[in-house]
Amino acid sequence: MINWLLFDKDGTLLKFDETWSEISLVIINKFIEQYQVEEEQSLQEELGYVDGKFLASGILASGTLSDIVKKFQKNANHENNKEVEDWTIQLSKDLIAEYNPETVVIDDMQNTLKHFKDKGYQIAIITSDDQDGTKRFIKDAGVSHLIDDTITATINGYQKPDPKMVEDFYAKWNVVPEEIAIIGDTPTDIQMGRNSHFGVVVGVLSGTGEKSDLEEADYIYKDINEFYEKETEWNGR
């Protein structure tokens, strides 16, 4: 029986394109200017931006800032990797402050999470974002009273799809993998569910992933609202 719902954030609870796409492209352009990188298209493709689209499996859609830093260090042709890292981290902070991206959530997201809570489910967010970004989302989205925990890429050094990312979570809440459903929009989310042997692995089409990207999921739904509507299909409570 499923008791815990682990929701990915960007693309699952949050509309990725409307929130992060502009900043993602500005970061690339600023890096190219700063380090005089000539292969713009090649860099974009390495980061998962191809033919004007964010790839579901790409770093920009499902990776961390640390992943971006590593790609920048590779492409900067600069001896001082620490300088590239510091510059990228500071740029990310500056752009978030400058653009102040609006938190655009999936339609009816708050009500759907509340319906799950009313039915007795516990809810966590599992994300490649850091703690600060995740807390900001929870506050801006007005769902702090609905979220029981957050599992982020910075809490223990592991990130999706590494199952070690959730080991502390199991101990904290005395929960086993079979009681957990993970819901996400990228192949990384699906692989996280498989690697961790979660009870149910769900793909949603509200983010960057297409149906073909999520074929390893147990179920694929339009969004979290359809996931709620089809509860009897994935959980025999």
What are these regions (language model features)?
Residues L60, T64, V104, I126, ...:
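Residues that cap or flank secondary-structure elements
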Residues M1-L5, E18, E33, Q110-K117, ...:
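Asp-based, Mg2+/Mn2+-dependent phosphohydrolase catalytic module
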Residues I2-D107, K119:
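N-terminal helical cap/lid subdomain that shapes the substrate entry/recognition surface
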Residues T12, T127-D129:
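Conserved phosphate-coupling serine/threonine residues in phosphotransfer and NTP-handling enzymes
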